[in-house]
């Protein structure tokens, strides 16, 4: 069994990709039977697997050290030729949609209708005339990513990457928290010209692409690019209303109480990361202890999760140390040719480190479990909202094992985790609606964008005050929310998934084994059913129905009160 560091990387030249793809497209067009179409599909899937593996390996090695000249060049290569590869696949998609054998393939179950539906959405997301714009977009995104990865924050004599600075945002000492946010704001302000300029470029590039493709603005194209098969802007509008009506008042009430316990009035942005006056629970140990606890947890959870964690640890499929020039976020990717998931994170000694072995491992488990699904190349593990349900739900299924990570602080962790999960819904809704407004108004100035952010904060998080925090008080919190620059419209997915994950938590409190079995069934199907159908099958409520979050809000608040009462007895 090879370790991830030993996996061989070979560039797949675009010329070779193009030759193979062209031959496959011709084979589909000239097919005399359904079987010939299937043979071409097999070849195309093999080509896609090789391409995605090479691209993912090069990106992973770039992200663990963004200053590595070789992998930086490889990443830039894929940024440049990726749109050309997409264009070849677009021609393949057109050929597949046009084949006279489509009905026969669907009826025989050789290719499920959802594959063809996903092809139709892909057609709406891509066109040869926007290739140059896609290359330009990739280049600007790379500039932003590198700037953020290399940005250092000078705090008390140390130069820290942002993940390490944010550790101080959870300090029980308010002066330290305030200072950390001041350093964050001042450092971002020093880069404000680039932050505004890069985003402005991205907005205009994306708007130009949308208009070239005949869309009114980038909102429509953005949804197609996300491959959404069961909801659009109207459904998200209803979801936003559900959050405003049922979640915002509960979160505001709970957070006000937390502020009172912390003895702070008003509740400032730099108070928001702290829940307990004595300091929030942190794992009882470093990296080794966390991984030992994770192994024990997954072995107890089920035989399958036990095999999964052994595989991940034996292949050294984690890179979790925070260091300079390492990409600042966390992600799970996979290398399909090797059926190998991989997790990158930046441990900083907070509870977030444990979330890596629950949340990101939830993604990895889905990759591991669906690796051999018959339609995994076309449909993956599902839409992003489905994928995030896998990860966010795993965080909650890990609750019975939190004593392995937090010892006697397990109860405090559960309270904090649930409060954070609920509090996230208004924030994620802001991130999504901000993007909608920005792309509907592409000619807004940087000041108008910042004003829109401030207005959304006042609407969805009225309990937080930004006043007096350098730069961030201007409405710039979004400038280090990297999704907004890098992957537009990939954020509401987290919110939709959170509503499903909260329901899995509430169900697991009634019958853990039954809820976990429903979760594994949900996860195992990958993308072979759309999100709303998977929810229905798991007996969970769709977040798009009017009033869908009322019960989630009430039951989650009741559970928080119950957890709080237990903590008060300690």
What are these regions (language model features)?
Residues 323-350, 367-368:
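Active-site scaffold of zinc-dependent metalloenzymes
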Residues 245-246, 370, 381-409, 417-419, ...:
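Post-HExxH zinc-binding segment in Zn-dependent metallohydrolases
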Residues 1-281, 293, 568-569:
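A well-structured
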Residues 342-346, 373-384, 410-420, 438-439, ...:
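Short beta-alpha connecting loops at secondary-structure transitions
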Residues 118, 230, 321, 357, ...:
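C-terminal, non-catalytic "cap/extension" segments appended to globular domains
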Residues 362-376, 397:
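Catalytic Zn2+-binding segment of zinc metalloproteases
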């Amino acid at each position: 069994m090879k370790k991830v560091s030993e996996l061989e990387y070979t560039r797949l030249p675009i010329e070779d990709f193009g030759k193979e793809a062209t031959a496959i497209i011709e084979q589909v067009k000239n097919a005399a039977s359904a079987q010939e179409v299937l043979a071409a599909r097999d070849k195309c899937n093999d080509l896609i697997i090789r391409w995605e593996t090479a691209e993912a390996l090069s990106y992973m090695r770039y992200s663990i050290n963004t200053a590595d000249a070789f992998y930086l060049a490889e990443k830039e290569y894929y940024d440049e030729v990726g749109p050309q590869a997409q264009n070849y696949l677009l021609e393949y998609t057109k050929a597949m949609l046009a084949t006279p054998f489509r009905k026969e393939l669907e009826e025989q179950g050789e290719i499920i209708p959802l594959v063809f539906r996903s092809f139709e959405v892909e057609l709406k997301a891509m066109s040869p005339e926007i290739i140059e714009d896609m290359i330009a977009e990739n280049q600007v995104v790379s500039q932003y990513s590198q700037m953020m990865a290399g940005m250092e924050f000078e705090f008390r004599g140390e130069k820290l990457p942002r993940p390490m600075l944010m550790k101080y945002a959870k300090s029980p000492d308010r002066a330290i928290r305030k200072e950390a946010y001041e350093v964050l704001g001042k450092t971002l302000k020093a880069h404000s010209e680039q932050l505004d300029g890069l985003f402005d470029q991205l907005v205009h590039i994306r708007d130009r692409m949308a208009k070239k493709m005949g869309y009114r603005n980038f909102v429509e194209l953005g949804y197609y690019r996300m491959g959404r098969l069961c909801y659009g802007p109207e459904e998200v509008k209803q979801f936003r209303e559900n959050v405003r009506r049922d979640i915002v008042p509960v979160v505001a009430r709970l957070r006000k109480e937390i502020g009172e316990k912390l003895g702070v009035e008003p509740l400032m942005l730099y108070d928001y990361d702290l829940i307990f006056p004595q300091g929030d629970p942190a794992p009882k140990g470093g990296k080794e202890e966390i991984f030992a606890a994770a192994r024990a947890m997954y072995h107890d959870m089920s035989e399958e999760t036990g095999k999964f964690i052994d595989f991940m640890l034996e292949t050294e499929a984690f890179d979790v140390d925070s260091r300079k020039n390492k990409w600042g976020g966390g992600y799970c990717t996979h290398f399909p040719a090797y059926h190998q998931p991989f997790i990158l994170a930046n441990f900083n000694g907070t509870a977030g480190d444990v979330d890596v072995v629950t949340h990101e491992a939830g993604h990895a488990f889905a990759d591991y479990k669906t690796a051999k699904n018959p339609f995994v190349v076309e449909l993956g593990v599902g839409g992003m909202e489905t994928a995030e349900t896998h990860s966010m739900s795993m965080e909650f299924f890990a609750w019975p094992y939190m004593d392995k990570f937090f010892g006697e602080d397990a109860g405090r962790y559960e309270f904090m985790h649930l409060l954070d999960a609920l509090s996230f819904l208004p924030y994620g809704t802001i991130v999504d609606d901000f993007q909608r407004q920005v792309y509907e108004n592409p000619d807004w100035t940087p000041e108008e964008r910042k004003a829109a952010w401030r207005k959304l904060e006042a609407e969805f998080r009225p309990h937080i005050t930004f006043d007096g925090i350098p730069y961030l008080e201007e409405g710039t919190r979004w400038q280090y929310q990297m999704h907004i620059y890098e992957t537009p419209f990939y954020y509401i997915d987290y919110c939709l998934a959170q509503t499903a994950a909260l329901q899995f938590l509430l169900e697991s409190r009634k019958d853990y084994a039954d809820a976990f079995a429903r979760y594994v069934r949900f996860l195992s199907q990958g993308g072979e059913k759309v999100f709303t159908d998977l929810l229905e099958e798991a007996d969970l409520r769709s977040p798009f129905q009017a009033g869908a979050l009322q019960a989630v809000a009430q039951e989650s608040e009741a559970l928080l009160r119950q957890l709080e009462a237990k903590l008060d007895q300690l």
